[in-house]
């Protein structure tokens, strides 16, 4: 059962959002060096490039992502290089899990970036006090994912005090993927 179903799509969208910034990439780089002693110079360079690029954007919706393509391509190359370095190492199981989590963080950003631009919303956020910019990417529609992963295997009950008996549930069904789910 899901309570407050009218908020479900927005909550899922928030969870499916990814953010990348100089700060997040520097944290990943530092942790990878500490845990696996890998060369993260390429990642550090990309982090600086991304920060410079983001500073040139206005805060808010990014309607043209073209100028970020070279930076994101360099991020993909740096991530692949780290994958290669890490796969050649003999790491303890616990360390390997931690290292993989940091690489997965980069993967999530790259996967979100790789989605069709018409299926995502991309924007820039900036903390003016610290001068930190972040690239944010979120899916526009979460209904297909909810239909497949949350409602595709078994029946579900969704409740919301904002819905009225006898009213239309169409918008809720559309936003949550209930109209796409194989089970009622």
Residue ranges and their predicted role:
Residues 1-184:
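ASCE RecA-like P-loop NTPase motor cores
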